[in-house]
Amino acid sequence: MSEIKYKRILLKISGEALAGEAHRGLDFEIVNSVCRVIQKCVDAGVQLGLVIGGGNFWRGVKDGADKMQRSHGDAMGMLATVMNAIAVADALEKHGMDARVLSAVEMNKFCEYFTRDTADRYLNEGKVVIFAAGTGNPYFSTDTGAVLRGVEIEADAILMAKNVDGIYSADPNVDPTAVKFDTLTYDEVLARHLKATDTTAMTLAMDNHMTLVCFALKDPENIYRVVCGQTIGTIVKED
């Protein structure tokens, strides 16, 4: 078994990545493949917190643009993350793991209310903790929510599993000359306006000296490779 580099992680998975080619809803083949890798990490002794976006059901900014009040659209987006969290918790339990959903918004019939101490206790007990409902406030992305939870649980690293395999100098889908970076500093990402995540999330990570790893979820084994310190995607850290 490979040596573990990051003992406690916050893994952020985009909702779209779990939707597969349908781009909406959940592709349970993908969900189960991710669960198997999470199980591999947990079996290796990794304490794992998880944030899942809601874009496979609803994207507040995009789907609600010019159609509804922004805070209402964001509320729907937060509820979408709860749907994903419940589904993934169910899948994790079917794989033999103990999972808990902690929501930033109280909804006691569906999941527990988040507190930092509850999350820390569950992680120390070996449970997978899924953080739902973002920050509980509109105008903040799930990426920002993921960084916030990563800071709160004192994660060794925040792993951003997305549909792109790292951070590029430009959009690789538009610019064929775009170059992928192996490592960057937070200052470089912000100064170059690179599309790693939103500025709020990036600044929060920088201010709290977090290591951020951006990589593709296309091969879920990348999660375990990153945990073991392999060079996958792009690492963002301090100078």
Question: Where are the regions that the model predicts?
Answer:
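C-terminal catalytic "cap/lid" subdomain
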Residues: 1-239
